[in-house]
Amino acid sequence: MRLAASVILYKHDDTIYRNISSYIQVVDKMLVFDNSENPNFDQNLIHSDKIVYYSDRNNQGIAHRLNQAILYCINNNYSHLLTMDQDSSFTDNAIANYIQLIKDNNDINIGMYGVCYDETCKVEHAAINEILITSGSIINISLAEKIGNFDENIFIDGVDTDFCIRLFQNEYKTILYHKIKIKHSLGETKKVITPYLKKSKRAVHSSTRIYYLIRNNLYLRVKHPNHHHCLKWGNILNEIKNALLYGDERAITIRAIFAARKDFKNKCFGKLIQS
């Protein structure tokens, strides 16, 4: 097993160095893709010759960078790719245990391995054919070659869902190791007062993120008509509700909702061009 890792940066903070350090010791190569228009990543702070750094001062999204990472693996004979978010890290010996589980699994039809990002998860068994998130997942490069590139129409939000569905359509599998945990941020959270006058914490996404969530979900519902159960429209409605009730840009969010529907209808995909 030759394992490369990739992380995609966008306006990161200094926690990125600690996060990368939580897994770089067990990978053979570390690919860092910087989508920031004004990059400030200092690879010297990690003290490793494993790092390959890419920056073109342009936000290319998630799918394009993952395709670059997979192509690098193909060209340099890496068998697997660990994909991480900039705000994700492994705890304790989790990454070493994770890799050992993969090495001990002889099923050649597993295209993607995933981990649990919910600290409250107490389940110990592995689950087959779950929709995995990219952060913390390990991709089988040979099967990724067979099903084709990540869909760059999606840009962000839904890239991982589409990839998993295409694995299923080609009779490959995913596996989720519940007992392997990562620390992972699901977005900005804020303290709120609910309509029932209770104090709570809610994830509140930006209007741009809401745009991608809606447009890409509509796109995937057409692309994969037999897998609507994988797309979790109810979760997106909840994100919209939180943005409208507790966000600071309600009017902009409403415009983003209409723009997402319009762009989907007009087949305007990829990166959102701000007017």
Give the predicted meaning of each segment.
Residues 6-26:
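Short, well-formed alpha-helical segments that are part of the catalytic scaffolds
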Residues 20-55:
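Acidic donor-binding segment of Leloir-type glycosyltransferases
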Residues 78-87:
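Short beta-strand-to-loop acidic/aromatic patch adjacent to the donor-nucleotide binding site
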Residues 91-124:
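Conserved donor NDP-sugar-binding/catalytic core segment of glycosyltransferases
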Residues 135-148:
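Conserved nucleotide-sugar donor-binding
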Residues 222-275:
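Non-catalytic, C-terminal membrane-associated alpha-helical segments of glycosyltransferases
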